[in-house]
C-alpha cells in the first residue's frame, strides 16, 4: 500500500436501495396505524401474529441498515440505556394545578357556574355558559413535547415550573405516538395523564407476589394504581418501565406554534381535544359539552354511577369553560385558572377504632387534634391517623377515645373522621377538650376571637415550632440550605445544639462532625451549604421567616413594593394593604409578626450572622429600564443561560416572547441563532448580542438603545 493510500478518505457506505427505504417507511406507517387501532381505539384490525411478523420484518431491515434507524421507529419504544438519574426540565409554559371544589354534591357544580358567570359579568337572563366536562384521572401529569412531528421530550409536572425528563420511559407507552401526522404543528406540547389500568395493576401485583414467593429480594406489591404508575415513570431503566404497561389520556396543550408561524387556530377547548384525537392521541370517550350548571350536575352524577365500572381510577370530574377567548379573559388566580375546577366525589369510607387523641403543633403554633386509629385500608392506603381539625369540629362530632368511627379520605387525600357510632361507645368515655398549654413547650395555648384554632404562644422557643420553622427557612424555595433535612433538624433541636434560626450559622465543622451518624464529608458539605445560603434574595428571606399567610407570591409582592426589609418590618397595616395580594388578614398577620420583639431579634441576629440580599428602591419610585419592551432570545448566549436572561429581562420590566413578530422590540442572538434571527432581519427588528442586552439592563429608561 502506498503512502498516499494511507491518507485516502474511506469509501462512503453505499446508500440503501430505494426499495428498502420505501419498505421501512411503509412498515413504520402500518405498524403505527395498527398500534393506534389496538391501544387507543381498542379496534384491532389484524391478528397479533401478523403484527409480530411485520414488526420482525422492520427489525431485520433496520438491523441490516442501521443508518436508517430513527428514534420514532416502533422498534425503539424500549431501547434506551438505563439512566444514572433524571435531568431537570423547565416547563416553557408552567403546568398549573386546578382548583378543587370541596363541595362534592350538586352545589359544587352550581358554585363553579355562579363564579364563572360573575367573573364574566353575565346576567340571569343571559344564556348558559358552554363548558367541557372531562374525567379527573388519578394518575401522573405529563407534558409531551413534539418538534417537527417527532416526540423529543416527556417531562413530569414536578413543582409546575420544573419537572424531570422521563422521555425514555414515556416512549414505552403504546398509546403515545412517537411521530405525528403531517398536519401537526412544528412545535407542540401535549399535556395529559399517565395512569395504570386496574387490570394491569392487578396483573402487576400478581407478578410481584410470584417474585416474592420465589425469594426475590427488594420486591413488594403496590398499594394502588397511581403509585405503581408514578413508580413506573420514574424507573431509571426503560425496560422496567415497559413492564408496568402504562396508559395515557390527553387533555390539553402547553407550548404550541402560534398561528402566525403556521400553527393551528383553535376557538374552543373541545375543538382542541378533537384535533388531538385526529393526531392519534387518546382522549377520554366520556368527554362532553355541557351547557350551564344543570348539565354539569348531570355529568357529575352520571360519571359517579359509572365510576366503579371504569377500567381505571378517577377521583372526580373537571369542568372547563369551552371558549378559549373567555378562558383568556378570566385568567388565573394564585396559579390556578379561574375557568376550570375539579369536582370530586365523596371519598371511600371505612369503620375503625380511636386509640388516642394526640395534639400536633405546627410551625405556626397551631394546635391540631389528631385521632390515632386502629390501622384501616381506605381508598387505596392504610390509614392510622385522622385529623379532627380543631376543638369545635372535635366537639361537634363528639369523638372520644375508644369510639368506633367512620373514617374517610377527604378529597381522597387527607383522612378524617366523619361520624361516631354512638351505640358502640364505651361507657363513661371522657369527652375530649383541647389543652390550655402547648404539649411540646408548656406555654399557654390561646384561641383568638374569631379564630377556630388554638395557638401556642411560645413562638420560637417552642421546640415543635423551631423544628418546623428551621425546615421552612431551609426549604429550597426559601433560603435553601441543602442537606438540612427533617432528621438532622430534629437531632439538632432535640440535643439543644440549636434553639433559634441564627444558631444554624453558629454551627461549626467540629460540632456537626461530632453528631451521631454525621460523617466528616456530610458535615463539611453542610457547613458549605450554610455559607452559601447567606447570599439570598429578599423574597426568599421574607418567605423563609414563616409569617402566617405569607406565601411565595406574597413575599415577592412585598419585596417588589417596599424594596427593603426594614420598610416591610416598619410598615403599618394601611401601608401593607397597598401591596398587591395583601388583604386585611394578611396585613394584620405581617404587622403582628414584626411587632413581636423576639421576631425582630431573630432577624437582626440573622443579619449579624452574615445573611444578606440585594435591596432596591420601592416599586413606586424604582425605574424599570426595559418596561414595555418585548424580547425574543435565540441561540446560545456566551455568559447567560436562556432562563437567566429571561429572568433578568422580566425583572427589569421587559417581556420575553417565544416567537418574533412586528411587535418584537429586540432579538437577543447568540451562537447558532436560527430561523428567529432570519425572521427578525426580514421584519427589521433590532438584533442585539448579550453585551448589548447587559448594557440595556444597566441603563436608565431614557438611555435605552433605540429599536
From Swiss-Prot:
Q: Which reaction does it catalyse?
A: NAD(+) + (deoxyribonucleotide)n-3'-hydroxyl + 5'-phospho-(deoxyribonucleotide)m = (deoxyribonucleotide)n+m + AMP + beta-nicotinamide D-nucleotide
Q: Which GO terms describe its biological process?
A: DNA repair; DNA replication
What is the top EC class of this enzyme, as a single word? ligase
**Which Pfam families does the UniProt record give?**
BRCT, DNA_ligase_aden, DNA_ligase_OB, DNA_ligase_ZBD, HHH_2, HHH_5, Nlig-Ia
Family per record: Belongs to the NAD-dependent DNA ligase family. LigA subfamily.
The name this protein goes by in its record: DNA ligase
Q: Where is the BRCT domain?
A: 621-707
Q: What does this protein do?
A: DNA ligase that catalyzes the formation of phosphodiester linkages between 5'-phosphoryl and 3'-hydroxyl groups in double-stranded DNA using NAD as a coenzyme and as the energy source for the reaction. It is essential for DNA replication and repair of damaged DNA.
